[in-house]
């Protein structure tokens, strides 16, 4: 049976529940709920864990309990416990440098300034792992200042307008992930990277 490991990045706790930075958590919770599977905390994995099957594939979903900046410790624990090849892992992560509603699937790359990805790269000692980046858009500029209010933006709650767009994004990502056992990865990459929120 094919095993697929999906790790969503975010921060644990009610305070961050609906924040833009928790896109990875929110998407995997959406996915797990679709298959009536609940998350349970596993201390040895430093994560909450959910598992279900689609056709001949086993999907294992993880929500690290380490907080965003230490995500790598959870990913390392998951890799070591299951003794898995990094090619089986997909990281789901927010990206403020992508417009809201855009999706980017990459097989490797730098952290792009994202602390969660930075931690994973440090712990795995490689940039060669797959990541699905979901755009949350850039924050509006602060009046009288040159810099964007990045922290407030990523930790801020998702608005109703944003949620309606992200619902479309989540459906597309999940539909694509469901095809991992029947379609070639290149097909999935093209499907996600060409997604247009205005046509769905």
UniProtKB/Swiss-Prot annotation:
Q: Name one GO cellular component term.
A: cytoplasm
Q: Which InterPro entries does its entry note?
A: Pept_tRNA_hydro, Pept_tRNA_hydro_CS, Pept_tRNA_hydro_sf
> Its function?
Hydrolyzes ribosome-free peptidyl-tRNAs (with 1 or more amino acids incorporated), which drop off the ribosome during protein synthesis, or as a result of ribosome stalling. Catalyzes the release of premature peptidyl moieties from peptidyl-tRNA molecules trapped in stalled 50S ribosomal subunits, and thus maintains levels of free tRNAs and 50S ribosomes.
Known HAMAP family for this protein? Answer: Pept_tRNA_hydro_bact
The EC designation for this entry is 3.1.1.29
Gene name as annotated: pth
Its assembly, as annotated, is: Monomer.
Q: Does the keyword tRNA processing apply?
A: no
Q: Which keywords does this Swiss-Prot/TrEMBL entry list?
A: Cytoplasm, Hydrolase, RNA-binding, tRNA-binding
Protein family: Belongs to the PTH family.
Give the reactions, separated by semicolons, that this protein catalyses: an N-acyl-L-alpha-aminoacyl-tRNA + H2O = an N-acyl-L-amino acid + a tRNA + H(+)
Q: Can you say what this protein is called?
A: Peptidyl-tRNA hydrolase
Task: Return the broad EC class.
Answer: hydrolase
Which GO terms of type biological process are on file?
A: protein quality control for misfolded or incompletely synthesized proteins; rescue of stalled ribosome
């Amino acid at each position: 049976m094919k095993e697929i490991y999906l790790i969503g990045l975010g921060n644990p706790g009610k305070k961050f529940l609906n924040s833009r930075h928790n896109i990875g958590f929110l998407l995997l919770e959406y996915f797990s709920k679709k298959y009536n599977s609940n998350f349970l905390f596993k201390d040895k994995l430093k994560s909450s864990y959910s598992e279900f099957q689609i056709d001949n594939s086993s999907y294992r979903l993880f929500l690290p309990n380490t907080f965003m900046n230490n995500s790598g410790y959870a990913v390392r624990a998951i890799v070591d416990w299951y003794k898995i090849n990094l090619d089986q892992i997909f990281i789901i992560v927010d990206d403020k440098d992508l417009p809201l509603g855009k999706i980017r699937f990459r097989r490797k790359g730098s952290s792009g300034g994202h602390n969660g990805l930075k931690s994973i790269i440090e712990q795995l000692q490689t940039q060669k792992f797959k990541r699905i980046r979901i755009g949350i858009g850039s924050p509006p500029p602060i009046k009288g200042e040159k810099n964007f209010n990045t922290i407030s933006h990523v930790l801020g709650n998702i608005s109703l307008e944003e949620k309606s767009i992200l619902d479309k994004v989540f459906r597309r990502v999940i539909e694509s992930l469901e095809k991992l056992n029947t379609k070639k990865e290149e097909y999935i990459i093209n499907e996600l990277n060409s997604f247009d929120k205005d046509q769905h």
